[in-house]
Amino acid sequence: LIAVRDVKASSAWYQTLLAAKAAGDPDHPHRLFYDRIMRGDALILQLHRWDDEEHPNLAGPDRGPHGHGVLLWFEVDDFDAAVDRVRRLGARVIQEPHVNPAPQHREIWIQDPDDYVVVLASPDGEARQGLRES
């Protein structure tokens, strides 16, 4: 779960980024301050608006840097398409697509609308062929 300023906007952003869907009734009033991002039956991410309900750790969005030391890491099986979605969203790219030699996969590091660092990575070993050719 991450705290965000605008649940509806963040939900749309992550749905596009991850080729996922929001759970439940899109018109439910609760969706203004909480949403779940799903891929099939799998819960991928929860979003909660800052300063709502009785969650003491979700108060004061400007008290400190958001997500310092936290990476939202998603393995995607469609890495090239995911990079295309990043470009369409106009996301701030921290690190362009590259091969991480340890897990032998490709990664792109970006920032979401609330300044959280998001990493999209292909499955481990996916880039093994390219490493042998270089």
Locations of regions flagged by a protein language model:
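Membrane-topology and secretion signals of cell-surface/extracellular proteins
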Residues: A42-H55, P65, G69, V118-A127
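Core segments of cupin and vicinal oxygen chelate
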Residues: L1-L45, W50
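Short beta->alpha connector loops
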Residues: D27-P29, D52, D78, N100-P101
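A short, polar/proline- and glycine-enriched secondary-structure boundary/capping micro-motif
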Residues: P56-G60, G130-R132
